[in-house]
Amino acid sequence: ESGYTQGIVGFGVGVIGDGSFKLGKNNHAGNQMIPLHNDGDKDANGHVDAYDHWGRGGGIVKARISNTEVRYGTQVLDLPVLASNTGRMVPEYFTGTLLTSHEIKNLEIVAGKFTKNQMSDQIKTDADVNGNGLDRAIVWGAKYKFDDNLNASYYGLDSKNALERHYVNVNFKQPLANDSSLTYDLSAYHTKFDEAANTYSQTTDNLSDRKNDIWALSTAYNTGAH
């Protein structure tokens, strides 16, 4: 990935990609790691054929003015409400625009719109796979550092024909004697699914009111230099 050109507005480009080779026959392909020919449909003999080798990737263009950056293209996301699955051999990709701003001291603001995603076992983007997958996802959020011991954040997601999700987090570090401290972290998610969404994460069978709430609280004790 390049840096930025000089000037009031700086421009840059970047590329991202991966290549894979399958060792052996692996007749049990279909585990969301190895892509399948014909989108996983069986052939005339009832077999599903996996790729022997494959590559994926894309590019980005980016611009920066002052302390604000805008990126468009293929990206690996790590937002609380929209994150790429990196637990497979290769990561999930999203295609779209992401703005990140640090114009105000100690405040980070993000906003973005994504129109395609590519799972780890997909050769083509979801727009080409039977019309299923991501239609349009809009994300927004902010994180503010009040001081060295306290920060808070909020992020939101509106994924068309899928779900709305909201996330809040508060993190506080309590200094103690002898270079030790206690850190408290509180997180919460609220998700509401559209009637047509495919999900098992629901607390009711009422399709017009499918939602869930998740809360998490953790405490960590730290001592010594860290």
Give residue spans per PLM region.
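Generic structural motif
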Residues: 3-5, 18-20, 159, 173-175, ...
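Outer-membrane beta-barrel translocator/channel fold
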Residues: 20-23, 107-130, 179-226
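Outer membrane beta-barrel
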Residues: 2-126, 142-151
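A conserved mid-domain beta-alpha-beta active-site/ligand-binding segment of alpha/beta enzyme cores
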Residues: 138-142, 154-159
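Feature captures outer-membrane beta-barrel proteins of Gram-negative bacteria and organelles
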Residues: 2-3, 59-66, 94-104, 129-148, ...
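A cross-family glycoside hydrolase active-site/sugar-binding cleft signature
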Residues: 14-16, 155, 187
